[in-house]
Amino acid sequence: MPPLDRADPGPDAVLNDETRYWRENGYLKLPNFFPHEVLDAYVEDCVAQGIAPHGWSDPCPFTHQPLMRDIACYRPLMDKIEMLIGTPMGLNLALTGWRSTTRTWHQDDYLNPPYINCHYAAVWIALEDIDPDCGMFEFVPGSHKWPLTRGAKIQSLLPSETRFEPDWPVQAEKIITGLLDRKIEESGIPIKSFQARKGDALIWHGRLAHRGSIPKNKELERRSLIAHYSAIVKRKDLPRLKRHRDQGWYFLLENSKED
């Protein structure tokens, strides 16, 4: 596990106000973190390409979208994530739609190979001021300390004919949601929303319970970029890496389209 997830983080762990907060709560807000001109260039490019508001269907469009990498591989962001996880990280997934995912309660790490073991983080980046009626990102502080339901355990609860299908995570959503609904109710921990302004970001732990809430106004866009990162030394299944200029690293999947 990452040093900050251990009972004793050890002598090499960075302990400051931010890492202590992360250790306790499982997330870290970064107010006004991104230069607006970098965000604007990406937004304008999305509109020009006709990608907005649905986003790319490709889960790794960053391999061929340098303006997205300017944001998701932004060096100060990569440095923050490395500080929290304790090892260099690489970008491995991006969700690019400008509507709420409406994905119900889940933890990210159950979808990872078990050897990742929390060496994982994700970031919610606001490309504009976010209207609270658009379906906000919600999370449960401290839920990263709850026991993780491993993917193999969830798969074992699925019918044998769907257990190993590529879309098994979709089939498992009802199970995961039910487990976390009960846990949240039992814990009594208040649910928090990330009401972000343009340039704000929120980093969250791979085990933090979170969801994309149902929008009150489905016509509203939620202009954001959601990026996921894995420890470079842990991703034995993703051996190809590339660096974005002098910024951060990103993984190349087999048959990745490149710019």
What are these regions (language model features)?
Residues 115-132, 195-198, 203, 228-233:
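Short, conserved beta-strand element in jelly-roll/cupin
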